[in-house]
Amino acid sequence: MLLHIIARGRIGRGPEAELVERYMKRVTWAQKISELPDTGGRVPAAAAGSRTILLDEGGEQMSSLEFANLLENWRDGGVREARFCIGAADGFTPDERKGADKVIAFGRATWPHLMARAMLAEQLWRATSIIAGHPYHREGRQ
């Protein structure tokens, strides 16, 4: 399953970019990152067999194990692409939220989009390592 990060804003070079690169290098699943301008630009069209997750402070809070189980179930169910969308400062429109398969949050706090991207990269590494049985995540699997 392709893990596709679609993010508003350019990450450039900096500590957040280094974290994203470090964690995404560890992920063995197919992956893609699409950067869009802060305003305008078109989100790439979703292909058949894809799922879209929006990262939003008002979304569902999932544990790392729940996130891993979601990805594993989608992969095993034939989902070809999981799209993770990180919005700009104003978040997502009601239509975008309505069209998403899932809206999740990394806690109740508001995070800058560059930090959210780094946190997503770490959670993708953690989830795929849990699925692979790698000892990175110390909590037992459900």
Curated annotation (Swiss-Prot):
It is an enzyme of class 2 (transferase). GO terms for molecular function: rRNA (pseudouridine-N3-)-methyltransferase activity. SUPFAM superfamilies: alpha/beta knot. Its EC number is 2.1.1.177. This is Ribosomal RNA large subunit methyltransferase H. Keywords: Cytoplasm, Methyltransferase, rRNA processing, S-adenosyl-L-methionine, Transferase. It is found in: Cytoplasm. It catalyses: pseudouridine(1915) in 23S rRNA + S-adenosyl-L-methionine = N(3)-methylpseudouridine(1915) in 23S rRNA + S-adenosyl-L-homocysteine + H(+). Coiled coil: none annotated. Homodimer. Specifically methylates the pseudouridine at position 1915 (m3Psi1915) in 23S rRNA. Belongs to the RNA methyltransferase RlmH family. S-adenosyl-L-methionine binds at residues 55, 87. One of its GO terms (cellular component) is cytoplasm. It comes from the Bacteria. The gene is rlmH.
